[in-house]
Each structure stands twice: as structure tokens, then as C-alpha cells.
Amino acid sequence: MLVKVSIHGQEYDLEVQPTDKIQEIKSKINELNGTPVEQIHPYIAGHAMKDGTTISDYPQIVEGSKIQVRVILKSQSDNSEKSEKSGKSEKDCILM
């Protein structure tokens, strides 16, 4: 089935199968625009799509559905302090 992927304000058409794992979807997105796989965080209807699941685990995904992608940039430095509440580096950044 064909779905839309929205990343950095651009939309791409992406062919997916119900048996495709989310890791495979991330790889396909990487092929579309070069974003590193580890920075790709797909969402459907506001819910994170988890690694280890497949497209069929998300019944709301049908032909023409839109998958939103958040790109989370991580600091390369192991010395950056992490926030107690979120556990994320203060240098983390989310791009949509």
C-alpha cells in the first residue's frame, strides 16, 4: 500500500507492506532523503511507531495514511549532561 511520509516539511510517497517492520520503514525513509536511521522516529496519529513492530500492528495505517517523522539529533559528545526528568541531552533537538 502507498502511504505518505512527512519529514522536514516535505511529503514523500512510500510503498509499504503490512509485514514491513518499523526498522525497514526507517531504512526506506533513509533511502528517500538520507536522514540517518537512528535519528528517524515515525509517528502515526500522534503515537510513536516502535521498533520490533510491523505496519499491521497499526490498524489505522491504510492506503494514503500519513506517517509523521520526527528527526531527533543527538549530541556526539558523551560528556553532555542529561536532564533528570527526560534523560535526554540538553543538546538533543527535534526537527519535524
From Swiss-Prot:
It comes from the Eukaryota. GO terms for cellular component: cytoplasm; nucleus. Residues 79-96 have a biased composition (Basic and acidic residues). GO terms for biological process: modification-dependent protein catabolic process; protein ubiquitination. Disulfide bonds: none annotated. Gene3D superfamilies: Phosphatidylinositol 3-kinase Catalytic Subunit, Chain A, domain 1 (3.10.20.90). One of its GO terms (molecular function) is protein tag activity. Residues 75-96 are annotated as: Disordered. Belongs to the ubiquitin family. This is Ubiquitin-like protein NEDD8-like protein 1. It comes from Dictyostelium discoideum.
